[in-house]
Curated annotation (Swiss-Prot):
Name of the protein this chain belongs to: GDP-mannose 4,6 dehydratase 2
Superkingdom in the source lineage: Eukaryota
InterPro entries linked to this entry: GDP_Man_deHydtase, NAD(P)-bd_dom, NAD(P)-bd_dom_sf
Pathway as given in its UniProt record: Nucleotide-sugar biosynthesis; GDP-L-fucose biosynthesis via de novo pathway; GDP-L-fucose from GDP-alpha-D-mannose: step 1/2
Binding residues annotated for NADP(+), in chain numbering: 40-45, 97-98, 119-123, 134, 194, 220, 225
KW Protease (keyword) present: no
Keywords noted in UniProt: Lyase, NADP
Hydrolase listed as a keyword: no
EC annotation from Swiss-Prot or TrEMBL: 4.2.1.47
Entry annotation: catalytic residues: T166, E168 (nucleophile), Y190 (nucleophile)
Length: 382
């Protein structure tokens, strides 16, 4: 009897091991497909990430919103490239929206991505004060819809999920620099919505054992940055001034301090986060800080103008060496609640991911100004 029981137990153990090996082999085969789904693919980060993933042999799917005008300028070179957009469908676009859970479920069940990069958001801080409900609907609840779509499609244990979080979570900073352990103190509807997004990712990771991660990205720029963001607004205006298409620029808080990096390097960090053995959250930053005023100095220096600053607050102006006012301050560009300083501590990303930024802020500014000058020369109305 004991021998029979021992044989039965041994057989049972062997079957369990076979199931485990079978499940492991199935998961390995699933991940080796290298299929990525990117929300927000038409944005700055989405376009750079698509380029990176295609270069690594991924099949890339992107979600775009239906609109009356095309908003695909940043990815046209990929969509129109026969190497990336061909019969094997290395690069595909799908209509969808973060406010429509049914379309998200349909896309995920059809595509069965191995990795999802959630970059879509209403990401303009000042606009979030004008559109607080919409910002919450897209940035907060939209993230929940996407996570729940993965769960509904029974892909919880297969898909790896990246959520684009933000340094705006720190808002009224509780310590300098800010790390993964720094308490959050959001100061805008955008930041509050992203805080929900952050914690719902953590919740799904803990509740369903999902490989879900947050990348707390500090400000990152490039020539593809949206025109309403302060860095791009500065470099576009400098380009127009150099071509005598504009006299000066109006800005808000010149003393605001930010940790700026290059978007191309930051999407590399996103990818590395999803290649780890265990899911975790990471601060992605340079660890260096510049003011908006200093960014202006660097940008104008690229066209041979050295700024001298006079006055304080809304009366402050920046004049070039000939005494011509190039920068003015306007109260309309101040936020109802300002975030005065943001400085990230990327030590964890450096140690765990092996990621470290190389492009400096002066190099970034140089690239952005040169790009905008070329753009304005080709089309003064751009």
């Amino acid at each position: 009897m004991e021998a029979r029981n021992a044989e039965g137990l041994e057989s049972c153990i062997e079957k369990i091991q076979e199931v485990k090996l079978s499940s492991f082999a199935e998961l390995k085969a699933f991940r080796e497909r290298k299929v990525a789904l990117i929300t927000g693919i038409t944005g700055q980060d989405g376009s750079y990430l698509a380029e990176l993933l295609l270069s690594k042999g991924y099949k890339v799917h992107g979600i775009i919103r239906r609109s009356s005008s095309f908003n695909t300028a940043r990815i046209e070179h990929l969509y129109g490239n026969p190497v990336t957009h061909n019969g094997s469908a290395s690069f595909s676009l799908h209509y969808g929206d973060m406010t429509d859970s049914s379309c998200l479920i349909k896309l995920i069940s059809t595509i069965e991505p191995t990795e999802i990069y959630h970059l879509a958001a209403q990401s303009h801080v000042k606009v979030s004060f004008d559109l607080p409900e919409y910002t919450a609907e897209v940035d907060a609840v939209g993230t929940l819809r996407l996570l729940d779509a993965i769960h509904a499609c029974r892909l919880t244990e297969k898909v790896r999920f990246y959520q684009a979080s933000t340094s705006e979570l720190y808002g009224k900073v509780q310590e300098i620099p800010q790390s993964e352990l720094t308490p959050f103190y959001p100061r805008s509807p955008y930041a509050v919505a992203k805080m929900y997004g952050y914690w719902i990712v953590v919740n799904y990771r803990e509740a369903y054992k999902m490989f879900a991660c947050n990348g707390i990205l500090f400000n990152h720029e490039s020539p593809r940055r949206g025109e309403t963001f302060v860095t791009r607004k500065i470099t576009r205006s400098v380009a127009k001034i150099s071509l005598r298409q504009q006299e000066h620029i109006e800005l808000g808080n010149l003393s605001a301090l930010r940790d700026w990096g290059h978007a191309k390097e930051y999407v590399e960090a996103m990818w590395r986060i999803l290649q780890q053995d265990t899911p975790d959250d990471f601060v992605i930053a340079t660890g260096k800080q510049f003011s908006v005023r200093e960014f202006c100095n660097l940008a104008f220096a690229e066209i041979g103008e050295q700024l001298v600053w006079e006055g304080e607050g809304v009366d402050e102006v920046g004049k070039n060496q000939d005494g011509v006012v190039r920068v003015k301050v306007s109260p309309k560009y101040y936020r109802p609640t300002e975030v005065e300083t943001l400085l990230g501590n990327p030590a964890k990303a450096r140690k765990t991911l092996g990621w470290e930024p190389k492009i400096t802020v002066p190099e970034l500014v140089k690239e952005m100004v040169a790009s905008d000058i070329a753009l304005m020369e080709a089309d003064p109305m751009a």
